[in-house]
């Protein structure tokens, strides 16, 4: 069988996101940082669904930062559509496994 190289290690989350309360139209950041080798890829999920970022759509108002954090250029929140409010987790993966962060809720403050 193939032996693991000494340096390779499964992901672990070293910075978890925390709950946020933000105003509509304001920027916001959910932090996430993971370690591992090879460097884990980071994806965000909200309510079990993968969050689309600028990596999926260059016009997206959500950006995946190099650190793994999720940055909202502005929080989108309307009567009918509330795409940003919810409970988020970040998932770090490499070929050795995956690590899931704590839940963080993003709440939009009512004016």
Language-model features and meaning:
Residues 1-111:
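Immunoglobulin-superfamily
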């Amino acid at each position: 069988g193939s032996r693991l190289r000494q340096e390779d290690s499964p992901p672990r989350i070293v910075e978890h996101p925390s709950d946020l309360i933000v105003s509509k139209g304001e920027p916001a950041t959910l932090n996430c940082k993971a370690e591992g080798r090879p460097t884990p890829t980071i994806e965000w999920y909200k309510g079990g669904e993968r969050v689309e970022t600028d990596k999926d759509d260059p016009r997206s108002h959500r950006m995946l930062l190099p650190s793994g954090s999720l940055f909202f250029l502005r929080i989108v929140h309307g009567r009918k559509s509330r795409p940003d409010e919810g409970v988020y987790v970040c998932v770090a993966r490499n070929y050795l496994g995956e690590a899931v962060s704590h839940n963080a809720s993003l709440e939009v403050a009512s004016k």
